[in-house]
From Swiss-Prot:
The lineage of its organism: Bacteria, Pseudomonadati, Pseudomonadota, Gammaproteobacteria, Enterobacterales. It catalyses: L-histidinol + 2 NAD(+) + H2O = L-histidine + 2 NADH + 3 H(+). This is Histidinol dehydrogenase. HAMAP family: HisD. InterPro entries: Ald_DH/histidinol_DH, Histidinol_DH_CS, Histidinol_DH_monofunct, Hstdl_DH. Disulfide bonds: none annotated. GO terms for molecular function: histidinol dehydrogenase activity; manganese ion binding; metal ion binding; NAD binding; zinc ion binding. It is an enzyme of class 1 (oxidoreductase). Binds 1 zinc ion per subunit. NAD(+) binds at residues 130, 188, 211. Catalyzes the sequential NAD-dependent oxidations of L-histidinol to L-histidinaldehyde and then to L-histidine. GO terms for biological process: L-histidine biosynthetic process.
Length: 434
């Protein structure tokens, strides 16, 4: 089915509707799973030596010093234009503003007289950021990960990226307070961060996108007792646009293509109650495709994408909630009125002047988002991902005495005698003191 095929949702059977919202299949092949497992074990056993061997094998690069020197970072900074540096500074300021506002106030309540309960927040002590290499370095992801890590107060923030690391990535790391940068890419970088080597420190949690090998490596280390936690499950990028008859077709098309150009497994969907809007968007997509350097990639993504005509905007919202897109763009009159009806989306963009690109780079929200349907249970990345919450309770003698019989009754009902005894012994001690 080509992207210019306009689909009438209400003419489809329930099974056809289900198929329309199916995402392109993703699963690690057995060979990838085995290869990644071998890489993890090898890096854990042989450390830096294994990292250098993998760099030669996969990156075709001889790495002498795994850690990037301060001189190299300074030289990278010199090579960048002032215009780009200023743009990064604006983006970081907005990201800082939004993520600082996410700080939770401490919770300190007396649940009943003499029973004090608190919730306090602490940073994750050490985090590792993975940034892919390639022809289009994702330096914006450095800003999105390192900025909240700094605000959270993480004591150690390190970054791995395949050599040679782009100047933009090195400068962004310095700008956002990353302490150490390492010339390591792929599954071997995830292994190094999870287990530690002579050069790369072991971290508590790993963040960042990557290819199938990186994704599988993150999955595997997150399930190993000696591994590390990860940010969230990863999947292909996606966008869903809800547009009414008043939307601008060129704007809608550009937003759809901005996701389609990410990769051939990306998925884009247009929902509109106006059949004429669907037709005009399809035409605009074709016009804009002709001008894109990554047109072939975008065209492959469009093969799994959809133009769907609905009964009304309420049905658009219903379908969107069922799909749960990574990015949801609402280009309708009074777009904000629909927000309260949205239940599942990674990030929402309202109105003609809120392109998804704004959130990707500089509005201040985070561009690391749940995808592949994980919006049903996962949140967009934020300050909380770099923190952990801890509860504290303190009972006075009076508070304990008032609550003791309740605890004893509940513990006895669960047949946990030692739990009950821990209370009964204290009750008896208080009686002896009286």
């Amino acid at each position: 089915m080509s992207f210019n095929t306009i689909i009438d949702w209400n003419s489809c059977t329930a099974e056809q509707q289900r198929q329309l919202l199916m995402r392109p299949a993703i699963s690690a092949s057995e060979s990838i799973t085995r290869t990644v497992n071998d890489i993890l074990d090898n890096v854990k056993a042989r450390g830096d030596e294994a990292l250098r061997e993998y760099s030669a094998k996969f990156d075709k690069t001889t790495v002498t010093a795994l850690k990037v020197s301060a001189e190299e970072i300074a030289a990278a900074s010199e090579r960048l234009s002032d215009e780009l540096k200023q743009a990064m500074a604006v983006a970081v300021k907005n990201i800082e503003t939004f993520h600082t506002a996410q700080k939770l106030p401490p919770v300190d309540v007396e649940t009943q007289p003499g029973v004090r309960c608190q919730q306090v927040t602490r940073p994750v002590a050490s985090v590792g950021l993975y940034i892919p290499g390639g022809s289009a370095p994702l330096f914006s992801t450095v800003l999105m990960l390192a900025t909240p890590a700094s605000i959270a107060g993480c004591k150690k923030v390190v970054l791995c990226s395949p050599p040679p690391i782009a100047d933009e990535i090195l400068y962004a790391a310095q700008l956002c307070g990353v302490q150490d940068v390492f010339n390591v890419g792929g599954a071997q970088a995830i292994a190094a961060l999870a287990f530690g080597t002579e050069s790369v420190p072991k971290v508590d949690k790993i963040f960042g996108p990557g290819n199938a090998f990186v994704t599988e490596a993150k999955r595997q280390v997150s399930q190993r007792l000696d591994g590390a936690a990860i940010d969230m499950p990863a999947g292909p990028s996606e966008v869903l646009v809800i547009a009414d008859s008043g939307a601008t077709p060129d704007f809608v098309a550009s937003d759809l293509l901005s996701q389609a150009e990410h990769g051939p497994d990306s998925q884009v969907i247009l929902l509109t109650p106006a059949a004429d809007m669907a037709r005009r968007v399809a035409e605009a997509v074709e016009r804009q495709l002709a001008e894109l350097p990554r047109a072939e990639t975008a065209r492959q993504a469009l093969n799994a994408s959809r133009l769907i005509v609905t009964k009304d905007l309420a049905q658009c919202v219903e379908i969107s909630n069922q799909y749960g897109p990574e990015h949801l763009i609402i280009q309708t009159r009074n777009a904000r009125e629909l927000v309260d009806s949205i239940t599942s989306a990674g990030s929402v963009f309202l109105g003609d002047w809120s392109p998804e690109s704004a959130g990707d780079y500089a509005s201040g929200t985070n561009h690391v988002l749940p995808t592949y349907g994980y919006t049903a249970t996962c949140s967009s990345l934020g300050l909380a991902d770099f923190q952990k919450r801890m509860t504290v309770q303190e009972l006075s003698k009076e508070g304990f005495s008032a609550l003791a019989s309740t605890i004893e009754t509940l513990a006895a009902a669960e047949r946990l005698t030692a739990h009950k005894n821990a209370v009964t012994l204290r009750v008896n001690a208080l009686k002896e003191q009286a």
